[in-house]
Regions:
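Start-transfer (signal-anchor) and selected internal transmembrane alpha helices
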Residues: 1-18
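Extracytoplasmic loop-helix module adjacent to an early transmembrane segment
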Residues: 18-57, 67-71
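Juxtamembrane segments of multi-pass membrane glycosylation machinery
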Residues: 65-89, 104-105
Length: 166
């Protein structure tokens, strides 16, 4: 239990720091990629024709759902996208914590360094980018997939329900 608390604390502190940082270092103003979003998608956010365009392969489909929720519930708020970015980043960090908790060979100092690098501010560009949160979510899903693969095929043998998750 003590190890679990220690491993979860950097994740929670990282999320809280980023939330604080976003609300103190940015404004709820459309800039950068948000200009493109506002001009091309927001006038008719639920129009499927805006989704099925020639460059559909360069777009992450989950962003459309996020954009619809943002426009319908918040009238389009850039903080919503940035907060989704922080939560998605936190999801990836939580999976790293789960892995470290299961794999006892990851020491406390190593884990803290991994979390420090994972939450480093070099990700700021992706946080204020209107669709960066989907990429962080994809990273977290990739880490989770690796975690489940390791549970199924790793040295510890298969855990209950791990194959179903895979």
């Amino acid at each position: 239990m003590k190890r679990r608390v220690f491993l979860g604390l950097p994740v929670i502190l990282g999320i809280l720091f980023y939330i604080w940082y976003i609300f103190h270092a940015s404004d709820n103003v459309a800039y950068s990629d948000y200009i493109r979003l506002v001009n091309s998608y927001l006038p008719d956010v639920t129009n499927p024709a805006k989704f099925f365009v020639p460059d559909i392969l360069t777009r992450v489909p989950i962003t459309y759902l996020g954009r619809i929720i943002n426009v319908k519930l918040f009238g389009y708020n850039t903080y919503f996208d940035m907060t989704l970015g922080v939560l998605s980043l936190g999801a990836g960090a939580a999976v790293l914590a789960l892995y470290a908790e299961r794999n006892r060979s990851v020491g406390y100092l190593s884990f803290l360094l991994i979390q420090f690098v994972y939450f480093s501010l070099n990700k700021w560009e992706m946080l204020y980018n209107g669709t960066g949160w989907a990429h962080f979510l994809a990273f977290g899903c990739f880490f989770y997939n690796y975690y489940v693969l390791e549970r199924v095929y790793g040295s510890g043998g298969e855990k209950k329900g791990a194959m179903a998750r895979l």
